[in-house]
């Protein structure tokens, strides 16, 4: 332990010395005048040039003398040439001793990795075939005071990558790719829904009554109104108010907040897509979800086969559709239907499986507890799990043939819940009764039970058309499409404990 501490202290002293040297260089730049100029305008991106001129030979480029202006961060400085990086990629810039003044040539030698420069010149190709910019002008735009991570080891400390995402993005192409994919996924989802006549909307983040999901909210205080408020746990009840109002197809992509544990699958602040369509049911949403996921896989991976860890998920095949009840029996053949239909036996199974059983749960909730403990983690390929008991689905419509369950599904891939959807409950009186049952659950000690929302009941009393709604966790979806093991890998700035 002592050796590790000494090594850490030595590294810190070395970094401090490098920072001090860079600050001296910045002081010299300040003495010359404006050390942070902002009058350069580039006309090209590094990777765009690589793509656009990939088929041009050395001779063709020399004859064309194509002028370009690029800018980026120095990732390599050999004195005779540098490699710079912008948001699209990298390109070499050649230090031409014939066209650059002596003062500039001397300055280039003092520039450090991480410095940001502008470069003007013409495109050329090296004998090895690399595209580069033969510079006629180069300037320092921003002096970097902190050294980049060692190029041989990179930024490998996972916690440091999360805490200093800006450095992670500078040095890790894999990280940059992940967040480009995330942006691509969100953009395509938006396009997919708008093409199907959905209207994008925004609903309140601050709410007086948290609702729309079984979760513990963050609480805050509105000073001007002198009242308690909550960060939303879901936008559902507001989106359904919009359906009541006549916006029959709506969606929102935004943040939700849940004051719960942190894990590789959970972050207290996360991004959710929720959409609602009138005159549809949960089966329509299954079809829509399969279509969306296939398009996203094809867009990102060029295939409907999605590699994740040592597995491959097949989005091109029909997703399995199985009820909660049937899935328990399928994946636990030692259990019988009679076991699941007896309250005392179901309670015993749930407790033995590791569920937190309080003792007042009904049969439906116990079945879901058993499912969560004994089945969820076994659902590797895409599964629509349907027919959730009404006790755990306070906002979902009861099934016409079996009122003990609801017209609801959750989508599981790789043992993780990715989406939750149902035919919406539009019976105002039934909704009021279910809210009251949730209040009783909360009084009995369930922190995640819902509050009574009188205004939402009033909205339903005006009449909501038959509607289907769905929520899809964007972060978990991006995890799948980028083969990322932790939700923190796909959130730019995940929540972390304060450093000691």
Curated annotation (Swiss-Prot):
Reaction(s) catalysed (UniProt annotation): tRNA(Lys) + L-lysine + ATP = L-lysyl-tRNA(Lys) + AMP + diphosphate
Q: Name one GO molecular function term.
A: tRNA binding
Which keywords does this chain's UniProt record carry?
Aminoacyl-tRNA synthetase, ATP-binding, Cytoplasm, Ligase, Magnesium, Metal-binding, Nucleotide-binding, Protein biosynthesis
Q: Cofactor note, please?
A: Binds 3 Mg(2+) ions per subunit.
Which PROSITE patterns does the record cross-reference, listed alphabetically?
A: AA_TRNA_LIGASE_II (PS50862)
Q: Work out whether the entry's keyword set contains Ligase.
A: yes
EC number(s)? Answer: 6.1.1.6
Enzyme class per UniProt: ligase
Provide the residue positions that the database annotates as binding Mg(2+) 2: 417
Q: Write down a Pfam family by its short name.
A: tRNA-synt_2
Against InterPro entries, the record matches this protein to: Aa-tRNA-synt_II, aa-tRNA-synth_II, aa-tRNA-synth_II/BPL/LPL, Lys-tRNA-ligase_II, Lys-tRNA-ligase_II_N, Lys-tRNA-synth_II_C, NA-bd_OB-fold, NA-bd_OB_tRNA
Identify which cofactors the protein needs according to its UniProt entry. Answer: Mg(2+)
Instruction: Name a single GO biological process.
Output: lysyl-tRNA aminoacylation
**Residues the entry annotates as binding Mg(2+) 1:** 410, 417
Entry's localization field: Cytoplasm
Provide one Gene Ontology cellular component.
cytosol
Where on the tree of life does the source sit, at the highest rank? Bacteria
The subunit field of the Swiss-Prot or TrEMBL record says: Homodimer.
The UniProt entry, under PANTHER family, shows: LYSINE--TRNA LIGASE, CHLOROPLASTIC_MITOCHONDRIAL, LYSYL-TRNA SYNTHETASE
Similarity remark: Belongs to the class-II aminoacyl-tRNA synthetase family.
Task: Kindly give the NCBIfam families that the UniProt entry links to this protein.
Answer: lysS_bact, PRK00484.1
The protein, known as: Lysine--tRNA ligase
Q: Source species, please?
A: Pseudomonas putida (strain ATCC 47054 / DSM 6125 / CFBP 8728 / NCIMB 11950 / KT2440)
> Which gene is this protein's source?
lysS
